[in-house]
Curated annotation (Swiss-Prot):
rRNA-binding is among the record's keywords: yes
A Pfam family matched in the record: Ribosomal_L6
Job of this protein: This protein binds to the 23S rRNA, and is important in its secondary structure. It is located near the subunit interface in the base of the L7/L12 stalk, and near the tRNA binding site of the peptidyltransferase center.
Summary of subunit composition and partner proteins: Part of the 50S ribosomal subunit.
GO cellular component: cytosolic large ribosomal subunit
UniProt organism field: Synechococcus sp. (strain JA-2-3B'a(2-13))
Family note: Belongs to the universal ribosomal protein uL6 family.
Name of the protein: Large ribosomal subunit protein uL6
Length: 181
């Protein structure tokens, strides 16, 4: 049994919390985030610590306890440090560029693929082949990075495509030619 929900969340000095019933708002140097929590979960603030507790020991309350604690901890980390995902383009002629508020990818299709940024996300391109997705909301950063990767996921034969930096692509052997008679 996991006991993640019982661990208190330490608040950095520059982070402010507002708890209004089931709604929690976190404000810090990088921005602000807010979220509504389920009615089975409560959050209390004691000095520079947050504790997440459940109202009863029912199965749904136990399931949500660790989840909500982690979501609140990610909100605190996001407004204080921020989150970042890096993607790498692998392939001849594969390029990324930023035009206005869109990421433009040339990844082997007959046309460039344009991906608009969601609000709260910053995208930067290092060189021609490294894309850096950053922001305060961990879920939004991950979803945006996954949407970019889904444009051209890495293929198993040559390894070309868009992958997370450091991702291992499982390679397959190509088809072996038939023996001639």
């Amino acid at each position: 049994m996991s006991r993640i929900g019982r661990r208190p969340i330490a608040l950095p000095a520059k982070v402010e919390i507002q708890i209004d019933g089931q709604h929690i708002a976190v404000k810090g140097p990088k921005g602000q985030l807010s979220r509504s929590l389920p009615p089975l979960i409560t959050v209390q603030q004691n000095a520079q610590m947050l504790t997440v507790s459940r109202l009863n020991d029912s199965r749904p309350a136990r399931q949500l306890h660790g989840l909500c604690r982690t979501l609140v901890a990610n909100m605190v980390d996001g407004v204080s440090k921020g989150f970042e995902r890096r993607l790498e383009l692998v392939g001849v002629g594969y390029r990324a560029a930023i035009q206005g508020s869109k990421l433009v990818l040339n990844v082997g299709y007959s046309h460039p693929v344009e991906i608009p940024f969601p609000p709260g996300i910053q995208i930067a391109v290092e060189g021609n082949n490294i894309i850096v997705v950053s922001g305060t909301d961990k879920e939004l950063v991950g979803n945006t990075a996954a949407r970019i990767r889904a444009v051209r996921p890495p293929e198993p034969y040559k390894g070309k495509g868009i992958r997370y930096l450091g991702e291992q692509v499982r390679r397959k052997a190509g088809k072996s030619g038939k023996a001639k008679k």
